[in-house]
Amino acid sequence: MYQDLIRNELNEAAETLANFLKDDANIHAIQRAALLLADSFKAGGKVLSCGNGGSHCDAMHFAEELTGRYRENRPGYPAIAISDVSHISCVGNDFGFNDIFSRYVEAVGREGDVLLGISTSGNSANVIKAIAAAREKGMKVITLTGKDGGKMAGTADIEIRVPHFGYADRIQEIHIKVIHILIQLIEKEMVK
């Protein structure tokens, strides 16, 4: 009944991944991002992550795998997803939704820390404001974006962009693969 649809969805996902994989710049950006994160951890820094909707879930998943575990039994790494409901509702009410991430970065971000901002469109105003706040704090910035990078294009130290112009779910599928690879590389780098 839905077998053709299922095959089409899986083929499109595989094609999106294959296109991403063809660009060596993506491979280099992932490696650079992992090394930047590991260097921050080794120097006593932390990573803050943020995004909206599915990207918010990815930001939480990234932090959870770092503080908990991914594949290896090892110490937890300092990672915080900006996901505290009381913070988000307070700042959203008192300042506005566009400030929910930047206020948190202002409060706990420090020089030597890293911000991971995730947006499939690259146009999330609250993530863009978080990037600006991170810059003011002297933090490094890594972004996971899609399409043409949107307004976030060129704002990060390292941008990992999925140049897919269809639905956001294909971009999110690559983002979660990138997140898992980042964690795997961080685990390898931290035991050196």
From Swiss-Prot:
Zn(2+) binds at residues 61, 65, 172, 180. It is found in: Cytoplasm. Coiled coil: none annotated. It catalyses: 2 D-sedoheptulose 7-phosphate = D-glycero-alpha-D-manno-heptose 7-phosphate + D-glycero-beta-D-manno-heptose 7-phosphate. One of its GO terms (cellular component) is cytoplasm. Transmembrane segments: none annotated. Its EC number is 5.3.1.28. One of its GO terms (biological process) is D-glycero-D-manno-heptose 7-phosphate biosynthetic process. InterPro entries: GmhA/DiaA, Phosphoheptose_Isoase, SIS_dom, SIS_dom_sf, SIS_GmhA/DiaA_subfam. It comes from the Bacteria. Substrate binds at residues 52-54, 65, 93-94, 119-121, 124, 172. HAMAP family: GmhA. Homotetramer. Catalyzes the isomerization of sedoheptulose 7-phosphate in D-glycero-D-manno-heptose 7-phosphate. The reaction produces a racemic mixture of D-glycero-alpha-D-manno-heptose 7-phosphate and D-glycero-beta-D-manno-heptose 7-phosphate. Belongs to the SIS family. GmhA subfamily. This is Phosphoheptose isomerase. It comes from Escherichia coli O127:H6 (strain E2348/69 / EPEC).
